Amino acid sequence: MNYGVEKLKLKYSKHGCITCKIRKKRCSEDKPVCRDCRRLSFPCIYISESVDKQSLKKIKADIQHQLISKKRKHAPDSAQKAAVATRTRRVGSDEQDNQVYLSKPLEDCISQKLDSMGLQLYNYYRSHLANIISIAPMNQNYYLNIFLPMAHENDGILFAILAWSANHLSISSSNELRKDEIFVNLANKYTYMSLSHLKTNEGSSACAKLGFLYSLAQILILCGSEICQGDVKFWKILLNIGKNLIENHVGKDVSRILTTTTEEPSLEERIIFPNFNSVVKYWLIVNFIYHDILNFNTTSFPIEQYEKFFQRDQNSLPSSANFIESIDSPIEEIDPLIGINKPILLLLGQVTNLTRFLQTMEQEEMLEHGDKILSLQVEIYKLQPSLMALEHLDDEKKFYYLELFEIMKISTLMFFQLTLLKIDKDSLELQILRNKLDSKLDKVIGTFLEGSLCFPLFIYGVCIQVEDMEKKIDLEAKFDDILKRYKCYNFQNARLLIRKIWQNEADGISEHDLVHMIDELDYNINFA
């Protein structure tokens, strides 16, 4: 019977947190953590309109998993450890690549260490940030498979991860100069806490052997965090600390890290990392090499050592490192940072090192190294991708990885011609390469590989002719498009550096040495 009284309908806010929407509760919309999530210690995440549907789906699935976990009683430690070990060793199919990676569940000890905001930052890294940083399939994403389990064992790594999340959240996708001060302060807080933990534990005898791997992981995460937020100085200090850690525990030859014997891992470490003395070492050094090469400075270790590190000579490895022989080994996988571009990265390092070396010489002395320069050019032209890592992927993903390989190859060739051959950017050869690079960039922007395009975009921008406004506008549009999704400030730094070079050219300042030009502008950025 209708008494003329219309039933009131509860209206749920469109701007509430994702957790309240999943629970079908009204959200107070208090930021950074709403009232219900603060009271119940739930992860509280607000999603901006710019987040794509795939990322939103992953975040929702991850929160649902955490909410369900809170309702269950904790399983015995042994069962939980077995589950973690199984998950760590799992090799997924193409269908699994699209699922959310569910890392080791948040235990009471982690929950007790972090407040609601800390839990939110942890969840943001786990469900979003780690997935956009890595360009590998989900089951090969070491930002999740290695760094997150390490964070459960080491507070310094945990705080470094939280700092990275805060730095990423501080960046606006709509305003290139504005940062959210709340998240900037949080990033500074957790960076300080992480570094304090490193200083506290660096002399611990209990961690003297295997412990340095935790310290190195911590430094590399902080380095990534600083590069992400646009730092142009502190990341270099961190990378140098990483170099010193390696030298102190491995020696002057970084390639020896896979064969250096260390203290037997603890039971917990063997459960979390079945190949602790191989896979983890491999990932940490690859991570270090990647950041070391992509900064236009002389590499911390000779390139020959990096080449030796990547060699697949099983005779140089102990029997405990027999993972090298497997097709599914890290060396044969798609790397989370490099993809299938290791040979290109090594040649890029050679080009940079030789360029820096020749800067100290007179013109006559440079001529003595002509054969080395020409041999490098031949090596770049001969570069071919290894298809072994791609054989289990579908045709679409193969296409994009191969396109990225060509993009990196063309960019390295252009960099080589600008720095060592001193070819003018207005030359026909460089303009042909630039146009070819342009067409391939358009194919990869907007895909899961776009985070690897900082260096290629920079080289493309440097080679745009002074009067070509159409290409300059096109490049600005490319940066705008990527930054809506990727939000890493080293892309902004690359854009600002390109603008400074353009301005110098417009002012009649002619400089044909690209590396010298970057030095003169005092812009020590990292293109990782």
Curated annotation (Swiss-Prot):
One of its GO terms (biological process) is positive regulation of transcription by RNA polymerase II. It comes from Saccharomyces cerevisiae (strain ATCC 204508 / S288c) (Baker's yeast). InterPro entries: Fun_TF, Zn2-C6_fun-type_DNA-bd_sf, Zn2Cys6_DnaBD. The keyword Transferase does not apply. It comes from the Eukaryota. A motif (Nuclear localization signal) lies at residues 55-62. One of its GO terms (cellular component) is nucleus. UGA3 proteins associate in oligomers, at least in the presence of inducer. PANTHER family: TRANSCRIPTIONAL ACTIVATOR PROTEIN UGA3. This is Transcriptional activator protein UGA3.
